[in-house]
Amino acid sequence: MSKRETTKYKIDRRMGENIWGRPKSPVNRRDYGPGQHGQRRKGKLSDYGVQLRAKQKLKGFYGDISEKQFHKTYVEAARRRGDTGENLIGLLESRLDAVVYRAKFVPTIFASRQFINHGHVNVNGRRTNIQSYRCKPGDVIEVREKSKQLVLVLESVQLAERDVPDYIEADHKQMKATFTRIPAFADVPYAVQMEPNLVVEFYSR
């Protein structure tokens, strides 16, 4: 198991939930956190603890991005007109690593970040290796020609455990996808309950 796979499953165990809906997640077999003290009974969380957990779960879902980067995204969401929680989800789902993952070009969000970093992705015909690149409606994301036959990609598009959401039009024959719109929170197919409102409360303290 790779280091990133270990990290991914550690996030699942820490949250006590299979946050990506993966069949191999260890929480499918046990419901306690990682480490030797993981089986200790958990006390009731304070309001702060509940808010922190909601933030950590959402941050973890997107590849456990850094706190600095996540907070920066929140600040941008808060500055925009409309509901801050909705804005936050829209910004996170607009990230290139999220779009590549949602389009099923790769099996996990962690693989997506590495895939982009290694230069396997074009956006509107140009090679892009920035994971946090903000996709705009109409942007065309494509696996580069030399990368289309990678086993990782060929196996990923066959995954039955998740579908491509309707705000992304994916052509798996051409290995190309169009980001059609910024989704609302209700449109995003999370495997577990996410609570962006609690994330907003956390940062508003």
Swiss-Prot record:
Output the Gene Ontology cellular-component terms.
small ribosomal subunit
Give the S4 RNA-binding domain ranges.
94-157
The record's listing under CDD domains reads: S4 (cd00165)
UniProt region (Disordered), positions on chain: 1-46
Q: Which InterPro entries match?
A: Ribosomal_uS4, Ribosomal_uS4_bac-type, Ribosomal_uS4_CS, Ribosomal_uS4_N, S4_RNA-bd, S4_RNA-bd_sf
GO terms (BP aspect): ribosomal small subunit biogenesis; translation
PROSITE patterns associated with the record: RIBOSOMAL_S4 (PS00632), S4 (PS50889)
Bias regions of kind Basic and acidic residues — which residues?
A: 1-16
Tell me one GO molecular function of this protein. rRNA binding
The UniProt keywords, alphabetically, are: Ribonucleoprotein, Ribosomal protein, RNA-binding, rRNA-binding
- Matching Pfam families: Ribosomal_S4 (PF00163), S4 (PF01479)
The family line of this record is: Belongs to the universal ribosomal protein uS4 family.
Q: How does it assemble?
A: Part of the 30S ribosomal subunit. Contacts protein S5. The interaction surface between S4 and S5 is involved in control of translational fidelity.
Q: Which PANTHER family match?
A: 30S 40S RIBOSOMAL PROTEIN, SMALL RIBOSOMAL SUBUNIT PROTEIN US4M
Report the function annotation for this chain: One of the primary rRNA binding proteins, it binds directly to 16S rRNA where it nucleates assembly of the body of the 30S subunit.
Name of the protein this chain belongs to: Small ribosomal subunit protein uS4
Q: Which organism is it from?
A: Bartonella tribocorum (strain CIP 105476 / IBS 506)
Q: Which gene encodes it?
A: rpsD
